[in-house]
Amino acid sequence: MVTQNKKILIITGSFGNGHMQVTQSIVNQLNDMNLDHLSVIEHDLFMEAHPILTSICKKWYINSFKYFRNMYKGFYYSRPDKLNKCFYKYYGLNKLINLLIKEKPDLILLTFPTPVMSVLTEQFNINIPVATVMTDYRLHKNWITPYSTRYYVATKETKQDFIDVGIDPSTVKVTGIPIDNKFETPINQKQWLIDNNLDPDKQTILMSAGAFGVSKGFDTMITDILAKSANAQVVMICGKSKELKRSLTAKFKSNENVLILGYTKHMNEWMASSQLMITKPGGITITEGFARCIPMIFLNPAPGQELENALYFEEKGFGKIADTPEEAIKIVASLTNGNEQLTNMISTMEQDKIKYATQTICQDLLDLIGHSSQPQEIYGKVPLYARFFVK
């Protein structure tokens, strides 16, 4: 219980929406707890420190999934010692130090891999507890901050990844990945489908086109899925691509087994009401799907965290990887044509899912902050070659 004024500083990043969603889930949960003595502030560190360079990096990151996969693969799988010699480790350092001096937080929470925090914990005098919410299912070196007080991870396998690289097991808690509470709230699936002019007796295949960043080939996929899965109907989420929504609506406007949508705030309802989802394996999306126990097909996952997430879900029996659209269509047909495998996948997800991650994490944060001491003055130094990047 927080009985005196305390402050949590959340460091996040806007490379994709997932980290921001996790941050918002935690902030909302803490606000719902009505703690008069607790204040929570959040900062997109890299964007605030280097707005122009970070914007360029974000565009490269998004395009890397389509055009620069090998380059991103090289970055993701590079050896830890290379990161230690890279300027990226010092990216945003001065901004972070200024934040700590100004805000004087009692606890720092990372919801984005932030290597610069390692500089503070290793090279500076800092006695502020540092906690990390990891938003993927397999460990990457950028998530590790030496001398951290706590890591919140998705599964027992993720915890073992940390232990294998020498992290103290007592600092790693298996909580699941925090998502919005609505994904754990029951809904009337049948009524939702009826309200959207779909047949509740058919198997609903959910496709998230916006997740792939491409706008071609989905018309053929929809047509082939319906041709090879006799009792299926397709819901296509086009995201912000108005061109894709327009073209698919024109093609399937008279087909009662196809519903074309643009951007939607109702992914929760669609996940809950569908039997299968074709998507990319972003950490938050698949955690939301996991909470709704909807088996997933991962179409051509990019090397890096996407592929690692997909491999983990396939290994656990929660999803399948398809390297091509044709392979995805075959998997859909196999799972929807009276195959018990789909039922078994749903049952496995029901047994293995971890509920109420957000609440569990927030309660532990309060326990940590209740034992934190008053932050002291921060001092330290960085290598000369890195000083250009520490703004």
Swiss-Prot record:
Entry GO terms, CC: plasma membrane
Keyword field contains Iron: no
GO aspect biological process, one term: glycolipid biosynthetic process
Localization terms from the record: Cell membrane
Reactions performed catalytically: a 1,2-diacyl-3-O-(beta-D-glucopyranosyl)-sn-glycerol + UDP-alpha-D-glucose = a 1,2-diacyl-3-O-(beta-D-Glc-(1->6)-beta-D-Glc)-sn-glycerol + UDP + H(+); a 1,2-diacyl-sn-glycerol + UDP-alpha-D-glucose = a 1,2-diacyl-3-O-(beta-D-glucopyranosyl)-sn-glycerol + UDP + H(+)
Superkingdom, natural source: Bacteria
Protein keywords: Carbohydrate metabolism, Cell membrane, Glycosyltransferase, Lipid biosynthesis, Lipid metabolism, Membrane, Transferase
Entry EC number(s): 2.4.1.315
InterPro entries assigned to the protein according to its UniProt record, in alphabetical order: Diacylglyc_glucosyltr_N, Glyco_trans_28_C, Glycosyltransf_28_UgtP, Pro_diacylglycrl_glcsylTrfase
Main EC class the enzyme belongs to: transferase
Pathway assignment: Glycolipid metabolism; diglucosyl-diacylglycerol biosynthesis
Coiled coil stretches, renumbered: none
Record-level Gene Ontology MF annotations: 1,2-diacylglycerol 3-glucosyltransferase activity
Signal sequence, renumbered to the chain: none
Family to which the UniProt record says this protein belongs: Belongs to the glycosyltransferase 28 family. UgtP subfamily.
HAMAP family hit by this protein: Diacylglyc_glucosyltr (MF_01280)
NCBIfam families: PRK13608.1
UniProt function note: Processive glucosyltransferase involved in the biosynthesis of both the bilayer- and non-bilayer-forming membrane glucolipids. Is able to successively transfer two glucosyl residues to diacylglycerol (DAG), thereby catalyzing the formation of beta-monoglucosyl-DAG (3-O-(beta-D-glucopyranosyl)-1,2-diacyl-sn-glycerol) and beta-diglucosyl-DAG (3-O-(beta-D-glucopyranosyl-beta-(1->6)-D-glucopyranosyl)-1,2-diacyl-sn-glycerol). Beta-diglucosyl-DAG is the predominant glycolipid found in Bacillales and is also used as a membrane anchor for lipoteichoic acid (LTA).
Protein name: Processive diacylglycerol beta-glucosyltransferase
Source organism of the structure: Staphylococcus aureus (strain MRSA252)
